[in-house]
Amino acid sequence: MSLTSKLSITDVDLKDKRVLIRVDFNVPLDKNDNTTITNPQRIVGALPTIKYAIDNGAKAVILMSHLGRPDGKKNPKYSLKPVVPKLKELLGRDVIFTEDCVGPEVEETVNKASGGQVILLENLRFHAEEEGSSKDADGNKVKADKDAVAQFRKGLTALGDIYINDAFGTAHRAHSSMVGVDLPQKASGFLVKKELEYFAKALEEPQRPFLAILGGSKVSDKIQLIDNLLPKVNSLIITGGMAFTFKKTLENVKIGSSLFDEAGSKIVGNIIEKAKKHNVKVVLPVDYVTADKFAADAKTGYATDEQGIPDGYMGLDVGEKSVESYKQTIAESKTILWNGPPGVFEMEPFAKATKATLDAAVAAVQNGATVIIGGGDTATVAAKYGAEDKISHVSTGGGASLELLEGKELPGVAALSEKSK
């Protein structure tokens, strides 16, 4: 299955249809009042798909989403109601809110709607049948009843004529709203379509040289990712906390009290062997910004491979020589996939290499390269320095993009209809 062979919203006729869209409105709410949205980015991201459905004559546009982790029970703290005023403001039109996401009353509201009426359903996760489980009073997982799950899925299916999935962030979860809506046409919205197109660009037909930049703390967390990428890439920059496991294991560099992944150290040799087999150039850091504690006000120092990091100090960023070699590798690449920052960028003294890597990535885009940032921390980096629109693609799904890059099939994508040949 190619990632680009799936039916998309532009392939289907929406005129006079009830268009059921799975969106990701899992927005952060102000902890004090629980109704103010602190970052509306996810709502803004869904607007092109919602507007397209309205502009193309949909009878009604029904939006379903989750918010937080209510664990299969109704909880006002996680209501989607606070989204309504923001959505009205952004769309410039009325939005009806339903107090549940399935059932006769919801069906009645949906079936009465016309003229592209937008309807937002209450949180899907108020029902244990959405995720397939709930938690009891002691916090233990309780599996949802199989028949109840089937009924819930039937209830969602009853609300639409066409299903659109625009929630890439949950595409790696086989939840009812992702895989259980049984309509003849199931298509991707613009957000999911863009994600699939860019990941196909990297994983299926990359322009070469193809570079992957991988950070993060543990080698063992990234092993599937590295394994899947090694046969595909031309170069690999290994940075962040996990680089110390490579340096100590392969070159016996003194790493002080830096992160060391015992389990990961056993596979480092295999990774390097596999890289050689596939002619992949592996770039590791050669110098470090060090600190006497994990804090922004730590006493800082500098160490090279030769000196090693002294006892009582840990590496929290890479140094200028490393950055130079990263920049050079980035500049000579045509496709760049970046997953994991080089340093603890949340703390100013250890953000320099991350910022420099981002600048090099932006420069690469300006020179015609494709740069894809794979969600999670690296997406936060792009947002922090206002570079989201200067990168070819910043993924909206941390876990989902990681699973794609590990070579796994995403249930929410697999469930979509194929384009007819």
UniProtKB/Swiss-Prot annotation:
Gene Ontology biological-process entries: gluconeogenesis; glycolytic process
Signal peptide: none
UniProt binding sites for ATP: K222, G241, G315, E346, D377, T378
Annotated binding of ADP, by residue: G216, G240, F345
Catalytic activity: (2R)-3-phosphoglycerate + ATP = (2R)-3-phospho-glyceroyl phosphate + ADP
InterPro entries in alphabetical order: Phosphoglycerate_kinase (IPR001576), Phosphoglycerate_kinase_CS (IPR015911), Phosphoglycerate_kinase_N (IPR015824), Phosphoglycerate_kinase_sf (IPR036043)
Quaternary structure and interacting proteins, as annotated: Monomer.
UniProt name for this protein: Phosphoglycerate kinase
Record gene name: pgkA
